[in-house]
């Protein structure tokens, strides 16, 4: 699927991608606020089970990495599949299931925009699959040297707009896109994840208002490795 085939309302192509990026950012902020609301709730002490349930949720969310990863997974899941169709887990014994249910309830009570939370898998599913298959094909081609593979991947990257690269990054943080960043923290460039190995998000602008897990922090190890090899992971370093 060519990016020009993607249409959202009257927006098409790269303008549609830009709109989708801001949709995702808005959803992230809404989910983040809903999670903060859950943390502030103090249930009636008369309901022991409810007190226990909230204590369990708050304990999970008190760990920064738990909270950040949960918000990323849920917000991207809502963005991709819609608010009524996505759960971070189907295991009802998992504390994340309880948080997920409560976040959804808060969104319903607050009458959050239905259009903002409409599914986008039909718009982006094939797009990301095709992009991944293209880069993976290059990575696995046995008849190419690493520098040749990099040059082919560079041509793919050159076709991606700033917002496409930003959306690719946030897709990679989700359950649906984690293969882009597996493995992480590797010091051998040839064995790095696809995004790091071929610097697929090199042109992400430093002036973007990145939310959640910042790309400069996430790829901290890979940034240092590329610098030791005389290259920059980002065209202009994303400090945060």
Where are these regions (language model features)?
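Intrinsically disordered, low-complexity polar regions and short flexible loop motifs
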Residues: 2-240
